[in-house]
């Protein structure tokens, strides 16, 4: 037989549980509401910062660059679209102009090849002629690589470095004096998680992104007094044609959408993250899932473990290719 005191205790416990639930749930929803409001206010501030800003996007014909162009245009930015394919750039310019809702800024198109150092000075001059100045430079264009170090000809290493590192550096240096003169500007480098950690069979690509990270970190420190912001963005895998267009050990096109790239985030999502990072004037942004993010910390805090993991990955990948 249950005693009255026991029943009273059970009833009291249930009442306390109910009270705690009625207290916690509103508190939880309140916190979520405050967080959502905070994110909304940040996005409004980002749009205000970038409205009417002159934004240059390299590699704008496809993938992340194309999506960045859409996001920044929708926010009211004045765009300069850069790339090699003039037809694709002009089509994008018309598409953006046609999608405008009260937007009056017709995007300009400037064609040049980052792999050709001789074209960059003239391209920078043409970019400056579009609106007279540049507020934001997004160094997005790049090329990926697949291959073993032992089989890769050095011309491939040079090509990847030219497009991913020397080209963006040259363009940045060409546009930098006008920013310094105005005491205003924002330079964005689209790097990669592979600019922070190195994985097997990506040597040329990873080396170019490590160089990118180092250069723009130095630039950030040197340009602080000139009021020029520098943001390095390091995404993980993005579902684009980057792997399809990657160069291989002998210089030929890889021509395949590999599994990790196919499972990557959409370019539209990452472009929105790029927009937010620029609007918030962030310095260094890692856009990856939990495991790659942890790999960055493991590389720093437990390098021996990281090296063993990468060696194991290399063995598995080599075995899968030979089977």
Swiss-Prot record:
Keyword Ribosomal protein present in the record's keywords: the answer is no
> Which cysteines does the record link by disulfide bonds?
none
Q: What are its GO cellular component terms?
A: endoplasmic reticulum membrane; membrane; nucleus; peroxisome; transcription regulator complex
SUPFAM superfamilies with a match to the protein in the record:
NAD(P)-binding Rossmann-fold domains
Q: Which InterPro entries match?
A: NAD(P)-bd_dom_sf, Sc_DH/Rdtase_CS, SDR_fam
Q: How does it sit in the membrane?
A: Single-pass type II membrane protein
NCBIfam families the UniProt entry points to? PRK06181.1
Q: What does this protein do?
A: Putative oxidoreductase.
Q: Give the protein name, as stated in the record.
A: Dehydrogenase/reductase SDR family member 7B
Give the originating organism: Mus musculus
């Amino acid at each position: 037989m249950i005693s009255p005191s026991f029943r009273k205790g059970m009833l009291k416990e249930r009442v306390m549980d109910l009270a705690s639930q009625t207290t916690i749930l509103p508190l939880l929803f309140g916190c979520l509401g405050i967080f959502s409001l905070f994110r909304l206010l940040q996005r409004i501030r980002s749009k205000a910062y970038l409205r009417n800003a002159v934004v240059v996007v390299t590699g704008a014909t496809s993938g992340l660059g194309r999506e960045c162009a859409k996001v920044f245009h929708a926010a009211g930015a004045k765009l300069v679209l850069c790339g090699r394919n003039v037809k694709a750039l002009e089509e994008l310019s018309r598409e953006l102009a046609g999608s405008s809702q009260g937007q009056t800024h017709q995007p300009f198109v400037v064609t040049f090849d980052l792999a050709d150092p001789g074209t960059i000075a003239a391209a920078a001059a043409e970019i400056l002629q579009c609106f007279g100045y540049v507020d934001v430079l997004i160094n997005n264009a790049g090329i990926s690589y697949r291959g073993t170090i032992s089989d890769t000809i050095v011309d491939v290493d040079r090509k990847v470095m030219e497009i991913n590192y020397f080209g963006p550096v040259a363009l940045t240096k060409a546009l930098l004096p006008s920013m310094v003169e105005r005491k205003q500007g924002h330079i964005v480098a689209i790097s990669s998680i592979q600019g922070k950690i190195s994985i097997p069979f990506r040597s040329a690509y990873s080396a170019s992104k490590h160089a990118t990270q180092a250069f723009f970190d130095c630039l950030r420190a040197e340009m602080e007094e000139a009021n020029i912001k520098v943001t390095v963005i390091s995404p993980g895998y993005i579902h684009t044609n980057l792997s399809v267009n990657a160069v291989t050990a002998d210089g030929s096109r890889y021509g395949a959408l590999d599994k990790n790239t196919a499972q990557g985030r959409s370019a539209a999502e990452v472009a929105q993250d790029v927009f937010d990072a620029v609007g918030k004037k962030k310095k260094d942004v890692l856009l990856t899932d939990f495991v790659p993010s942890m790999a960055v910390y493991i590389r720093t805090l437990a390098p021996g473990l990281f090296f063993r993991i990468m060696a194991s990955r290399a063995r598995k990948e080599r075995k899968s290719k030979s089977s």
